[in-house]
Curated annotation (Swiss-Prot):
Its EC number is 2.8.1.7. This is Probable cysteine desulfurase. PANTHER family: CYSTEINE DESULFURASE (PTHR43586), CYSTEINE DESULFURASE 1, CHLOROPLASTIC (PTHR43586:SF8). PROSITE patterns: AA_TRANSFER_CLASS_5. Pfam families: Aminotran_5 (PF00266). The gene is csd. It comes from Borreliella burgdorferi (strain ATCC 35210 / DSM 4680 / CIP 102532 / B31). The modification N6-(pyridoxal phosphate)lysine is found at K235. Gene3D superfamilies: Aspartate Aminotransferase, domain 1, Type I PLP-dependent aspartate aminotransferase-like (Major domain). Its cofactor is pyridoxal 5'-phosphate. One of its GO terms (molecular function) is cysteine desulfurase activity.
Amino acid sequence: MDFKQIKSNVEKVKFLRKDFPILNKKFDNKYIIYFDNAATSQKPKNVIYSNVEYYENYNANVHRSGHKFAIQSSIKIEKTRELVKNFINAESAKNIIFTSGTTDGINTIASSFFYSKYFKKKDEIILTTLEHNSNLLPWVNLANLANLKIKLAKFNEMGIITPEEIEKLITEKTKLISISGINNTLGTINDLESIGKIAKKYNICLFVDAAQMAPHIKIDVKKIGCDFLVFSGHKMLAPTGIGILYISNNMAEKLHSSKLGGNTVEEIFIENEKIKFKASDSPNKFESGTPNIAGIIGLEEAIKYIDNISMDFILEHDKQLIEYGVKKLQELDEVEFILNTNLKRNSIISFTVKNIHSHDIETYLDTMGIATRAGRTCSYVAFFPENLNKDHLLRISFYFYNTQEEIDNFILGLKKVIKELS
């Protein structure tokens, strides 16, 4: 049976779940309820088998040797690059850089800014109070090294960074805005297209952390108008250790790579008794050494899988799960939502339970085969007293293979935890 021939969304999800081995195995006599998809997604068979096929049948390094295995591997790499280009509607495959993940992509550009001497002293970078540490610390480090100023845009009562909040922070010294499309703590969605127009208006670089966005919402870098965009494969069905960095043509020409080695130069020569080199064009100049070939091949299969079921289906299913999950949690008097219940969420619900620490809930739920996330979700600034004013929370995050039945079982488990630990 073909997925597209199935009419009912419930039946579609049942059909898709068969593709995920980990969802069809019992652990301690229980099937896992996996509600930690914001951390990483599970992997379908086609992704898993693509890696086995590569290592068994054409394992070789890429863009170097001329034998058939190397040629086949290189073709697969460039095929995936083209697929990613279409996935985010980039201008060219040359704008697509393979990284080890979102964090690596952000650090790559932060260090490239430094090596390229892009900023002047006292220039400003705008971040937000809802950023993951990975979209905070590289910029803080850059600011410390280059004597820059960091400004933080605050979220409103709906957990959103408004374009107006961004614009009021802009001065003639503002050179970069870095913001997440969907934040990993609340799951709220920022208006990137409006923020992109503001960045263009003031001739400011726009950097987008799309780690939570890429698995759930169609990305169009042309509509956003961003100069950079990063995401990780492992949150959208692909293996760990593979990510994407999109760089606009303009910025690819301006920046020097901070990571040099094989594949990054066209020529090395001696001039005035000094060794010099001519850097390769993008993407090569940003991809030093041997890439994660198996990861890239797995990413190709992951994108094919998502394209087949469509982002429209994923978005609609996310919406149904969020609405149902919020409704069921509202029935529990002990549950306190972060900010409020009416947030425009994508795939994440965060809350606390009165008088019970979230880590205790997480641990107890794990004994029932329910995977969640507790703590500060690697977004420490968000938890400051002037922001969320929380020490911890419990986060549940969905993907298209999750079901309302799983939410029902989660609620039963949570009720048991509350009864036992209150």
